[in-house]
Structure formats: C-alpha cells, structure tokens
C-alpha cells in the first residue's frame, strides 16, 4: 500500500511524535472550540466531586488531535495516562493487565477502538460499567469465573469509524465528542505556534500558505511546516515567506488545496473513466490499487467536507468544484442530472 508514504497522509508517523510541538493544556489547544469548552466543564465537575470522569469517545478523521486531547485531559485531571490501540489488545489477558494496573481516576486511552477484538470487547463492558473484570480461568469442566474489582478509571477512546462500533460499546460512553476539520485560520495559528517553537521565522502569508494546503488537519500542517523549513534553510532564507512555502510545496507535489498525486488520480479516474460518476467504492479501490478503508478514511473525508465529491446510494459523484479544479468540463448529461437532483432536494 502506498498511502503511508504520502506527505499529506493524516496517519501518524515517527516525525509527528515531537511532544515539544504539542499543546499542553486545553487553553493552548487551537480549534475544536465547542469540544474544548464542554471538556473543561466535565473535567472541572469531576475534579470538584472527586470522581472519575465519565468515559469519553472521540470521533473524527485521523490527525485532528484525539490523542493530544486525551493526554491533556489526564494532565488537567492530575492523573496518570496510559495509551494503547485496539489492534494491540489481542486477547482478554492483555486488557486485564492494562486495567488492573490503573490507579483511581487514571485515564486509559484506546486508539482505533473500532478495531478491538470482539472477545476483548465483551470483557470491556463490565469494566466500563461496573469497574469489574469477569474472567474465565481454566478450560473445560474445570473452568471457573473470577471477578476482579478495578479502580474507577476513565476510558478515553478514539475512532475514525463510528459506524463500526457495536451499539453496546457506543452506549457505554457518557461523553461523545465529534471532532471536525480545522479552518485555515485555526491552522495558521497552529503553524505560527509550531514555527515559534522551532525558532523558525515565518511571515503571516507564509503560515497561511502552509495552512491552506494542510487539508484541515494539524498533523499535516506540522509535517508540511517541517518540510518547508528544510527548503528555507537550504535556500538560506531569512524567513519562510509565501513564495518559499509555495515553491517548496509545489515541488513536493502538494497543490493549492492540499491534494497530492493520489488525490488527483482519484478525481481523474472518476472524471475520465466514469464520466464523473456515480461509481462504486470497490471499483475506485480496484482502479487505484488502494484498500477500501484507506479511501474511505484517508482520501475521501476532506474531499467530501470541501465539496469535491458527493456520496450517493449509487456511488461517488464529482461536483462542479471538482471539475473546475481538474480544469475540465462535466458532460452535459451530468449537469442536467445534477440540476434535477438539486430541484428534488429543494
């Protein structure tokens, strides 16, 4: 799969783990204003009562700050933070080891909880609801059930695919939080903060140019900033200007809306091979030689949010914005079909 090597992939990479660039409090955190305001209330209320915070579920595309927010929550609650991910917890014993080592009110963060083993998920239910572990010891006729009391903890989980969570698991989270893509203005603040922490001079226009191409995602903004810094330093520039940022990102094949070669292949394939759509996701995946999950989780969310494609019951359809971006004219019959659809919706 080619996707992890993409500069604009929102998935985690080693260079993204620089904790010095991460905000350390909710006040330092830029964006997600509604979510932050609500979390502040819930955290303060839990601290005042001396209780564990209700379990929290973060939902949203990768790279929007779910892990960072979980770490900040633990810090502001004044408790320990433990982190893992759904695929890592292979069996019930793995989960039991994590839970039994938690202290009172600690935060356990599980990323990609939608990929949790179903057998492990069953063990998690009583742990979340009653703070007890129900384990089966032994096999066959000698097997017996053992209950283990747990410290009252807070589970903070993250998922990019809410629809893949079972209803019993989803219903056990008292605080669901949906995160959305960031505005260019918010990303500009994030880029300027990152540049300041890197001791990198940057102009307002330079920061905005990077922000415009970051696909609404702070993780991508930080990665683009690092690469632009490389170009600026080699060019011995006094500061990152709009021109330097534009030249660097253009050379890195990131266009003015944050699309790379794979995004353009996606749009071109629908436009050229299928007349703008509709075309099914399995056909797109086969044509791009990319897994369906990568297309639905990585490529499409930002395109849909920006209005480049529509998901319809019959498949994906390019919008007028996409045709304009490609520099192509949509087929006449497609324009007529979209006009009829617009009239029906209104």
Curated annotation (Swiss-Prot):
SMART domains: AAA (SM00382)
Gene Ontology biological-process annotations: DNA recombination; DNA repair
Binding, DNA: 292, 311, 316
Gene3D superfamilies per UniProt: 1.10.8.60, P-loop containing nucleotide triphosphate hydrolases, Winged helix-like DNA-binding domain superfamily/Winged helix DNA-binding domain
Compartment(s): Cytoplasm
Keyword Translocase attached: no
Broad EC category: hydrolase
Ranges for region Small ATPAse domain (RuvB-S): 183-253
Binding-site list for ATP: 21-22, 63, 66-68, 129-131, 172, 182, 219
Ranges where the record places region Large ATPase domain (RuvB-L): 1-182
EC number(s) from the headed UniProt entry: 3.6.4.-
Pfam families (UniProt xref): AAA_lid_4, RuvB_C, RuvB_N
Reaction catalysed by this enzyme: ATP + H2O = ADP + phosphate + H(+)
Molecular function via GO: ATP binding; ATP hydrolysis activity; four-way junction DNA binding; four-way junction helicase activity
One annotated Gene Ontology cellular component of this protein: Holliday junction resolvase complex
Segments for region (Head domain (RuvB-H)): 256-346
Keywords assigned by UniProt, alphabetized: ATP-binding, Cytoplasm, DNA damage, DNA recombination, DNA repair, DNA-binding, Hydrolase, Nucleotide-binding
Functional summary from the UniProt entry: The RuvA-RuvB-RuvC complex processes Holliday junction (HJ) DNA during genetic recombination and DNA repair, while the RuvA-RuvB complex plays an important role in the rescue of blocked DNA replication forks via replication fork reversal (RFR). RuvA specifically binds to HJ cruciform DNA, conferring on it an open structure. The RuvB hexamer acts as an ATP-dependent pump, pulling dsDNA into and through the RuvAB complex. RuvB forms 2 homohexamers on either side of HJ DNA bound by 1 or 2 RuvA tetramers; 4 subunits per hexamer contact DNA at a time.
Domain remarks in the Swiss-Prot or TrEMBL record: Has 3 domains, the large (RuvB-L) and small ATPase (RuvB-S) domains and the C-terminal head (RuvB-H) domain. The head domain binds DNA, while the ATPase domains jointly bind ATP, ADP or are empty depending on the state of the subunit in the translocation cycle. During a single DNA translocation step the structure of each domain remains the same, but their relative positions change.
PANTHER family (alphabetical): HOLLIDAY JUNCTION BRANCH MIGRATION COMPLEX SUBUNIT RUVB (PTHR42848:SF1), PTHR42848
HAMAP family linked: DNA_HJ_migration_RuvB
NCBIfam families: PRK00080.1, ruvB
The protein's name: Holliday junction branch migration complex subunit RuvB
Protein's organism: Rhizobium leguminosarum bv. trifolii (strain WSM2304)
Gene: ruvB
């Amino acid at each position: 799969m080619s996707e992890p090597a993409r500069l604009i992939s929102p998935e985690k990479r080693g260079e993204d783990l620089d904790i010095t660039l991460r905000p350390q409090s909710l006040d330092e955190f830029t964006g997600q204003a509604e979510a932050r305001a609500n979390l502040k209330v819930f955290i303060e209320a839990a601290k005042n009562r001396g209780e564990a915070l209700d379990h929290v579920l973060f939902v949203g595309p990768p790279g929007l700050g779910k892990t960072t927010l979980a770490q900040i929550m633990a810090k502001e609650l004044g408790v320990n933070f433990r982190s893992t991910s759904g695929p890592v917890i292979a069996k019930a014993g793995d989960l039991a080891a994590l839970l039994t080592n938690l202290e009172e009110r600690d935060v356990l963060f599980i990323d990609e909880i939608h990929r949790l083993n179903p057998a492990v998920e069953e063990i998690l239910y009583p742990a979340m609801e009653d703070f007890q572990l129900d384990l089966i010891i032994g096999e066959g006729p000698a097997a017996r059930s053992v209950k283990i009391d747990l410290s009252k903890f807070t589970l903070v989980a993250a998922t990019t695919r809410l629809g893949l969570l079972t209803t019993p698991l989803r219903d056990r989270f008292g605080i669901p939080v949906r995160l959305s893509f960031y505005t260019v203005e918010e990303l500009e603040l994030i880029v300027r903060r990152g540049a300041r922490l890197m001791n990198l001079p940057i102009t307002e226009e330079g920061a905005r140019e990077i922000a415009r191409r970051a696909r609404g995602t702070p993780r991508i903004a930080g990665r683009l900033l690092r690469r632009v810094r490389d170009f600026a330093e080699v060019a011995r520039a006094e500061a990152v200007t709009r021109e330097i940022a534009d030249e660097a990102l253009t050379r890195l094949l990131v266009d003015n809306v944050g699309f790379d070669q794979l995004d353009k292949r996606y749009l071109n394939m629908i436009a050229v091979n299928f007349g703008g759509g509709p075309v099914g996701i399995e056909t797109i995946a086969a044509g791009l030689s990319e897994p369906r999950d990568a297309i639905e989780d990585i490529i499409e969310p930002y395109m849909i949010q920006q209005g480049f494609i529509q998901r319809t019951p019959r498949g994906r359809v390019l919008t007028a914005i996409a045709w304009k971006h490609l520099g192509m004219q949509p087929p006449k019959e497609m324009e007529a079909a979209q006009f009829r659809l617009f009239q029906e919706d209104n």
